[in-house]
């Protein structure tokens, strides 16, 4: 997953979720809504697997410092299948000479946005999910930042749902739901 933002920061997005289940070949479990029926042929021998690391949270800001995004998580791979790391959550910008709002970062699922510090008519946008694009989608967008007076930031996106938007008073959005296999 992606790292979260600091100082009214948005939540980090979940890493991309990929799943395959073909009822005639895949066993007796219930697949999530994200499953596809595309098989991957494997031959005996080594299969390259990389487990991507989670992203670091954004750095704490000094007085007058610029905002930073949480770091995007690293890509995970199994053979030829890749799942993107989650997008980083955004942070409020405490530099008075700069805009005080940041958008969430894109990724497997998008990072949530910081609250709307730029005044009426502007909204910090949650980061895009399913980046890079695959079908079915590997994740969803992060939530938008809340209104100026609310200090509510967006939740990070999940495997099966978007993160919810921040709202007033001081309500941070909930992260998007994950996927369940049974």
Predicted feature descriptions by range:
Residues 1-182:
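Glycine-biased low-complexity/repetitive sequence motifs
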